[in-house]
């Protein structure tokens, strides 16, 4: 059957999506690439923790960096779901909200520039205020952005798209991470950090303008719903879907499975005297690993099982933590970061496609996306804080062991409890 006849059989909205699919796919990849180019200069698992490490030796405060980002990303998402369930388009809110996850990097650049003039406690307070702003800005952006993307990309391509976008993100982030390592090594501190954060803001601004070109069809008008009715509907869906509840349990476990990730670099710096330049190379290995694995794991999830791919990532998380626990030289950190890249794809990228697939229709999609991120949010901040506290009081080994055990429980739950949701 010709493509013209197929388009004639589709609804106007479906035909619009098919007509603009290639354009939106490419725009999504460029958006991810430029976003990654920016984040590589200000990584939440390397560059920003290193900046905080220059101000304090507290593993607890260092662990707060990814904790705040994760909590900010996850916590607000359900609170935007009620509005989104009634929205006819998601792009306007996405563009307004995402400003708040980009501008704070300019704030970090200014803060780093004035480090010589301010006390360390003041710098730390200002830094964490910027991280809170950025984290919650990302969280309020996440649900409308995910809904927009999963609306303009057909469901059977969700895993492939998110995998390829993640590859673009991490590929360019790997390039900027190497550059950031050189900047940290060659430019005097704190100007080196200020320059990194300024470059992050510059490329995130380019990403913003690319994102604005997304072509989104207008959905049919939807009835207004009282807020109490929305929360009642959310609770009803949660009670009725035992498989989704099991998935939420896995999402909570995944926060503890990845608890050790924030401390690998700091541990290597403290125990094996890793240089800032070497740290940049390790981050590049981590990101390039995700470049290779993200499209493969995303496509594999579309063809086989997103649940199965997540379980493989859980095993990767466990192995990386065990190797970090047993490492006796810097050479061990090459496989550690490769295994971490497998785990990160499974913990962060694959669940986006999997959580959307639980929804029965487009109206339920914001609710499922919101619940899959907001409900695990307390664990997202508790896990790194617990890991940092354990590292401060009992040593990094305990943090790594607990992370490995959590990852094994996550893998077992995915194989024994969670089932693949039916494709809709």
Indicate residue ranges for each PLM-predicted region:
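Helix-loop boundary and gating motifs at the non-cytosolic
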Residues: 2-75, 84, 91-94, 98-101, ...
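Loop-to-transmembrane helix entry/capping segments in MFS-fold secondary transporters
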Residues: 59-60, 91, 155-164, 276, ...
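Helix-to-loop junctions at the C-terminal end of transmembrane segments
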Residues: 76-89, 184-185, 293-305, 391
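A membrane-interface helix-boundary motif in multi-pass transporters
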Residues: 90-92, 121-123, 182-202, 389-407
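Structural signature of the two symmetry-related core transmembrane helices
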Residues: 92-110, 198-201, 308-323, 401-404
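Helix-loop junctions at membrane interfaces in 12-TM secondary transporters
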Residues: 110-130, 325-337
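Intracellular juxtamembrane helix-capping segments at the cytosolic ends
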Residues: 140-153, 346-360
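Flexible cytoplasmic inter-helical loops of multi-pass small-molecule transporters
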Residues: 215-233, 422-424
